[in-house]
């Protein structure tokens, strides 16, 4: 659990898009190996195919590539595919690991021509390393400062031509100079249920899980549009099927297993439902501040804001307003309650089916 989350949240929710213990090795076995095997993101795949094919035809390295989007959508898998399509070696690191310029210089000095350098969470790279990266991306060289004070000297070092692939969940947190140095930027969107079902059927084949078509659709519909969540739910359903049934995952088995893990039809878990229930039942639908809402569910504000809210907002159940969080009609309905007729969003009355006056109404004076 991240220290900033605190509270009672253990970070092990089956519908968390972040990596949790046990995901790493299994995710590696499920990753697609080339663009043809990658399911979903058709626009990104087409654009990347053009970028990579063009570079190979010219015999050079492609432009630096930035992959942005929420966690769990396949940015790391796409970076590995880029290296495989180019026939190059992949060097992996992360923004938080590059605390000093020397850390980056050591990594860059070990690159050979054509290598792909993947920096995950690139928005968290330290400022000194980021400034060194500017020169490396543009001119394939770095200036290493030796010594301190007036006697310090700068030694230029050549860097083999490489392709940087950066991944970020917060593209807005990137500085302008860094963002401008990427020649191609791809935003990865959430997946459709049909795409997630395809991913699940492929993963089931790799893991040796007997997964029925209807069961695949059932799991996909609760996966929040995220392949990482879909694959994690598949493993939990597999456990249930092997322990309490004959190992075959049917729709009924999937439904029963997901009920055990507190994942409902929309992919909401216990904490999500607690937040909705508190917002509607304790505060009449809001508006209410996130700190007050967090106290009501016994969690830290950061947990509510970073773990629960993104999906609840995307699902249209919570609206963020200047006055606080407001429950939408969908939230009331999800809890089996009737929305109030005078629904209010952020202090503004929602007017439904009101005819708009004509500018050319002959009865107007």
From Swiss-Prot:
One Pfam family matching this protein: RuvB_N
GO MF annotations in UniProt: ATP binding; ATP hydrolysis activity; four-way junction DNA binding; four-way junction helicase activity
CDD domains xref list: AAA
Keyword Signal: no
GO biological process, one term: DNA recombination
Gene3D superfamilies (alphabetical): 1.10.8.60, P-loop containing nucleotide triphosphate hydrolases (3.40.50.300), Winged helix-like DNA-binding domain superfamily/Winged helix DNA-binding domain (1.10.10.10)
Positions that bind DNA: 320, 325
Enzyme class: hydrolase
EC number, UniProt record: 3.6.4.-
Keywords recorded for this protein, A-Z: ATP-binding, Cytoplasm, DNA damage, DNA recombination, DNA repair, DNA-binding, Hydrolase, Nucleotide-binding
Region forming the signal peptide: none
Catalysed reactions listed for this entry: ATP + H2O = ADP + phosphate + H(+)
A GO CC annotation given for this chain: Holliday junction resolvase complex
Binding site for Mg(2+): 76
Positions of the UniProt region annotated as Small ATPAse domain (RuvB-S): 192-262
UniProt: ATP binding residues: 30-31, 72, 75-77, 138-140, 181, 191, 228
Subcellular location: Cytoplasm
InterPro entries: AAA+_ATPase, AAA_lid_4, DNA_helicase_Holl-junc_RuvB, P-loop_NTPase, RuvB-like_N, RuvB_C, WH-like_DNA-bd_sf, WH_DNA-bd_sf
Region of interest (Large ATPase domain (RuvB-L)), ranges: 1-191
The keyword Cytoplasm is annotated on this UniProt entry: yes
Region entry Head domain (RuvB-H), spans: 265-365
UniProt cross-references to PANTHER family, sorted A to Z: HOLLIDAY JUNCTION BRANCH MIGRATION COMPLEX SUBUNIT RUVB, PTHR42848
HAMAP family noted in UniProt: DNA_HJ_migration_RuvB
Domain comment, as recorded: Has 3 domains, the large (RuvB-L) and small ATPase (RuvB-S) domains and the C-terminal head (RuvB-H) domain. The head domain binds DNA, while the ATPase domains jointly bind ATP, ADP or are empty depending on the state of the subunit in the translocation cycle. During a single DNA translocation step the structure of each domain remains the same, but their relative positions change.
Function in brief: The RuvA-RuvB-RuvC complex processes Holliday junction (HJ) DNA during genetic recombination and DNA repair, while the RuvA-RuvB complex plays an important role in the rescue of blocked DNA replication forks via replication fork reversal (RFR). RuvA specifically binds to HJ cruciform DNA, conferring on it an open structure. The RuvB hexamer acts as an ATP-dependent pump, pulling dsDNA into and through the RuvAB complex. RuvB forms 2 homohexamers on either side of HJ DNA bound by 1 or 2 RuvA tetramers; 4 subunits per hexamer contact DNA at a time.
Name listed for the protein in its UniProt record: Holliday junction branch migration complex subunit RuvB
Provenance organism: Rhodococcus opacus (strain B4)
